[in-house]
Regions:
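Short aromatic loop motif centered on NTY/YTY
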Residues: 125-203, 208-210
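Short, solvent-exposed loop/turn segments at conserved positions within beta-propeller repeat blades
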Residues: 59-61, 69-71, 108-110, 189-193
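Mid-length scaffold segments of soluble, non-membrane domains
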Residues: 98-130
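Short beta-strand elements that form the blades of beta-propeller/WD-repeat-like
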Residues: 96-106, 169-176
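Short, surface-exposed coil-to-beta transition loops
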Residues: 83-86, 99, 109-114, 155-159, ...
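Sec-dependent N-terminal signal peptides
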Residues: 4-13
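Terminal domain-start segments
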Residues: 20-92
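Sec/Tat signal peptide C-region and signal peptidase I cleavage site
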Residues: 14-19
């Protein structure tokens, strides 16, 4: 308990230093709840608290409370186990950083809806950041039209999730395409998927390793 109090006091002293790029984060244990504004750098200071088995909560742009799943040097992954799975990756703090929120529905095939937000204002910038990809982007060249039609019928919708730094184009996280498919369908589709995939970002191509 003493350690928890010291951590909370230290975090409270940090909030003024990072007031320009704040995030609303909830620290919660079995007996108490404290809401403090922090940014990404402060988030990294929560590592000890996280590793101690405590739960750290944040709020998504649509005000849903989610538990932070992991904290790394490059991004913070937050998720919640509800009917839908919401994941967000925070780019490094800055005026042109983005938050990418993916909502994955447990349908067959699983479907992810993606929205991108400015990390500071939370303005929706999805159309400015992403060029949508379709199943055609992932089917290998040389696949016959008949086979393409068969694959599209089997997988009627496909959303691919990427998190990028809007200023550098650095890819912070991604869902592999085939994770959107039921396993039995993927086994049939796998031979027809391209080995390398490309993310089209504002007219530029970024190759993603398989």
């Amino acid at each position: 308990m003493k350690r928890l109090v010291l951590i909370l006091l230290a975090l409270a002293s940090l909030q003024c230093a990072f007031a320009a790029t704040v995030r609303e984060v909830i620290l919660r244990d079995s007996t108490d709840r404290l809401m403090i504004p922090v940014d990404r750098n402060t988030m990294l200071d929560l590592y000890d608290y996280y590793d101690a088995g405590q739960h750290v909560y944040a709020k998504t742009p649509n005000k849903e409370e989610v538990e932070i799943d992991s904290i790394t040097d490059n991004y913070i992954c937050i998720s919640t186990s509800r009917i839908s799975l919401i994941q967000a990756w925070l780019a490094k703090a800055g005026s042109d950083s983005i938050v990418v929120v993916s909502t994955t529905y447990e349908t067959k095939p699983r479907m992810s809806i993606v929205r991108a937000y400015n990390a500071q204002s939370f303005d929706d910038i999805t159309d400015k950041v992403f060029t949508p990809l379709t199943l055609d982007d992932f089917i290998a060249k040389g696949t016959t039209k008949a086979k393409r039609a068969e694959l599209k019928e089997k997988i009627p919708g496909l959303y691919v999730v990427y998190s990028i730094n809007a200023s550098t184009g650095e890819i912070l996280a991604s869902h592999h395409t085939y994770e959107c498919f039921p396993k039995e369908d993927y086994d049939a589709i796998k031979p027809y998927l391209v080995e390398k995939r490309y993310l089209v970002l504002k007219g530029k191509k970024y190759r993603l390793a398989r």
